[in-house]
């Protein structure tokens, strides 16, 4: 009986291990394909897309760097990502804190409003967003920043709300008795206690903003990394080599950021869901 149960357990582990390997290969192969082809001439890629480079060809990186004007679009994208993510975190954390600690009944209605907005697809509101951006003279790269604040806050508020509810109110009351003001309590007591969910929101929103294509296409038209990569996708000819090189270069910063904070993602989402 024990032998049978151990055998079944071993079989399950083998199946699980094989499944994980298959899924890992499935997700890693596209990245491997892009990196390998970034070192191959465009003619070789067209003839044999899945081949390996005969020798290291760095011309794709030189072409991508020049044609994309990479330093400029990189700084633009970095500015939008940092300011957009930072604004979402500060605004959403303060809003969620106000909703959690508010004694007004309308607070629950406002929270339900934010939660409901999560189910609205972006494609439904992208035309009104374009019209609004034009009316507010936000049709530029800096104009993307307040747009991301508005689009990213509902999800962040939902995540912060569940986490802030777990913060003991007695800590805030003790600080208030000692004369601490609301802003001091929020920034010095509440925020340090929710740093896990802050890191989670930072990673999720940074990945979203850095990789976003549709909103910059509607609002900015040009000036970000994702839009600059369109120049390699012509109507009659595609420069696969420089395209792969540009994808490789642009992926390095956000992958490094994700790897640095990845441990907070599952921890923060799981804790926020349970505490919410």
Walk through the language-model features, giving the residues of each.
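A structural signal for multi-pass alpha-helical bundles of membrane permease subunits
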Residues: 3-276
